[in-house]
Each structure stands twice: as structure tokens, then as C-alpha cells.
Amino acid sequence: MNKRRIAIVIALLASTWAWGQTYSGSRTYDGEHRHVIDGTLLGGQNVVTGWFIGESATYTRHLTDRWSVSAGEQVQLFKQLYSLDVMGTYRLPLGRTNLYFDGRLLFNRYDRWNVNEPIVNLSAYWETDYVDLRLGESLVRYHKIGVKEEYRDYTTTGYTEPLVMTFGLGVNIRPRSNPWNLGLFFRNFDQFYYENWNINWGVRFHATLRPDMKLYGEFNVRPAGSISQLATRYETSLKLGLHYVL
């Protein structure tokens, strides 16, 4: 009887271990491809700036199966928005899930308004087969440049938002490792900005084109004033990108 119980326990532990090994997160190192390149085209309409188009690109280097670093850039025409960022990531496997800790430095240049926006963000990202959740904090600084000396006594040249909460939730209809997938997301950030209560929601997808290449995209809606203290505009945008590993 005891031998049978021991055998059952061993079988359960073995099956649990195997089950935990079958899941591989979308940001994990596969043991072969250390270099990752993402290129994205985007376009949309904003009630403040009108129509806009742009592009972004990100390079990621997996240093180990736990540590990675990345750098990216973005250009949005008509908005005259130019962005740069660097990020370091640590991955902590938790059974069948992954927990990522991200530290990020971001710089936005709003040339149309002569404003610089440096951002520091620290966040944790939990990823399962069907659900992903991000929580964190940002420090956002807005700085108006080129203000004439005679106006500086009564003109605000900048201000800081020291505690900008980062939150996001995504849900997939199929396992994340499936060759194709559809999902919904709800968050207060995008690739190159973080805002307090300016909510984004939309639809996302990905489709594997070949073992080293994946097509992905998002349709993103920002309703003006939706549980928001800051937003005064309404925006819709569409992204289409390629994810390539080598």
C-alpha cells in the first residue's frame, strides 16, 4: 500500500514537472536565438494632431535564459514625436508561468510643442498561457525648452509626475504558444508612453509565418476622459509588426 502511494506521488510530481516545462513565454530565450528584432508600422487619428503615421524598432539581446537587455526607437510623423528607450529584464520562472522584472529609461521629444519627456519605469509582468498582467510605477518629467528668459518668472517650464501607476491586463483566446492567437487588452500605457488614468483598450493578434518570424498587430482605442484625470483627446491607432529571431 505504501509503495503504491509513493508511486502515485512520484507520478504526480513528474507530470507536474513536465506540465511546467511545456510553457514558454513570449519573451523567453529559446536556447538558440539570442537576438530578437521587432519592427512595427503604425497609423491612426488623434483629435489634437489629426492623422499620423510612424514606425518603431526594438532590438533585444538575451544574455542568459534569465537576463536580457533591449533598446528601441520610434518616429511618429505629423505628431512630430521622436522616442528612444533602453530596458533591462530579469525573468523568474514560476512553475507554468513567468514573472519578468523590467527597468526602463525612456525619452520622448515632442518637437511640435518643444517639449522633452524623460521617463523612468519599474514594473513586474506576469505571463501565463492565456493571461498577462503588468503592474509598476513611473516617474514622468515634462520639460518645455526654449522659454525666453524674460518669461521664466511666470511661465512654467516643466513639471514632474512622481507616481504614475502602470497597469495592464491582456487575455488570449488560445494558448500563447499557438501558431496564431487573438486577444483583448486593457492598460494605461503603450510602447513609448505611460499615463495615469488614460485608458487604452483594444484587440491584438499574432500569427507565426515561419519558425524564426512572427506577424503581430494591435487595434488600439483611447476614449477621451475614460476614468481619466489627464486625457482630453480621443485616439484610435493600428499597429502591424514583424518579430524576428536570429
What kind of feature is each model-predicted range?
Residues 43, 55-61, 73, 86-90, ...:
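Residues on the lipid-exposed face of transmembrane beta-strands in outer-membrane beta-barrel proteins
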Residues 19-76:
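Short glycine/proline- and aromatic-enriched beta-strand/turn motifs that initiate or cap beta-hairpins
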Residues 11-20:
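Hydrophobic h-region of N-terminal signal peptides that target proteins for export
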Residues 41-47, 53, 73-79, 92, ...:
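Transmembrane beta-strands of outer-membrane beta-barrel pores
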Residues 195-246:
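Predominantly the C-terminal beta-signal and adjacent terminal strand-loop region
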Residues 117-191:
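Detector for outer-membrane/organellar transmembrane beta-barrel domains
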Residues 35-36, 65-70, 93-101, 129-135, ...:
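Repeated loop/turn-to-beta-strand initiation elements of outer-membrane beta-barrel proteins
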Residues 35, 49-55, 80-84, 114-120, ...:
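Residues that define the transmembrane beta-barrel architecture of outer-membrane proteins
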